[in-house]
């Protein structure tokens, strides 16, 4: 490994090129370097090809056979961006609530189909929760097992109609996905029988 020796560091903002033990060449701007663990963080052009995005890659220098500094940054790096702590706390709280909701559904014995439907609804309408095996949406609509359109109950109105449309679309999408997977499996089976 041609990594820095004792007392040597990668400067934030420098551009480096690394060759991994798998022969993969990685090139990018140094975002961070932790000397004790020999972990290097690079910001690289996006693998999606989108110009306004970047990939951030963590590299363990123990698994790198070569490191070349392309352009060493000599000036002081720009100050770190400030963090919106309340926004981060809200996101962490929301993620925790989502995970607890998933865990509740699993422990309550809710079917995979019910869990998937809950996730689909939750993407659009955050105000949904579990009540035993029932999905409660906006405290107005109850969806009971087996979670089909006809299992949506509530007072007639736009909320019930909207939820029924989401449920209907969810199962339509699931069915079209299954059909596509079956046709791909049949094509693969057909291709393998032709090659034998």
From Swiss-Prot:
Signal peptide range in chain numbering = none
Where does the Sm domain lie? 3-73
Q: Residues in domain AD?
A: 81-175
- Molecular function (Gene Ontology), one example: RNA binding
Chain positions covered by the region annotation Disordered: 174-196
Source species, domain of life: Eukaryota
- Enumerate composition-biased segments (Polar residues): 177-196
Its taxonomic path starts at:
Eukaryota, Metazoa, Chordata, Craniata, Vertebrata
Q: Which SMART domains match?
A: AD
| Name of protein | Protein LSM12 homolog A
Its gene name is lsm12a
Which family does the UniProt entry place this protein in?
Belongs to the LSM12 family.
Q: Which Pfam family, any one of them, does this sequence belong to?
A: AD
């Amino acid at each position: 490994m041609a990594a820095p020796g004792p007392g040597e560091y990668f400067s934030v903002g420098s551009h480096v090129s690394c060759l991994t033990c798998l022969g993969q060449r990685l090139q990018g701007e140094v975002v961070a370097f932790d000397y004790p663990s020999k972990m290097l963080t690079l910001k690289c052009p996006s693998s999606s090809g989108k110009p306004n995005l970047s990939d951030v890659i963590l590299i363990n220098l123990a698994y790198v056979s070569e490191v070349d500094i392309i352009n060493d940054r000599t000036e002081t790096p720009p100050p770190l961006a400030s963090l919106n702590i309340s926004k981060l706390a809200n996101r962490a709280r929301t993620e925790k609530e989502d995970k607890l909701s998933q865990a509740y559904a699993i422990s309550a014995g809710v079917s995979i189909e019910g869990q998937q439907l809950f996730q689909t609804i939750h993407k659009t309408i955050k105000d949904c929760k579990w009540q035993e095996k029932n999905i409660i949406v906006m405290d107005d609509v109850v969806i009971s097992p087996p979670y089909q359109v006809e299992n949506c109950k509530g007072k007639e109105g736009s909320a019930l109609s909207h939820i029924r449309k989401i449920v209907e679309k969810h199962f339509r999408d699931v069915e079209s996905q299954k059909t596509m997977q079956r046709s791909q499996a049949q094509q693969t089976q057909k291709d393998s029988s032709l090659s034998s």
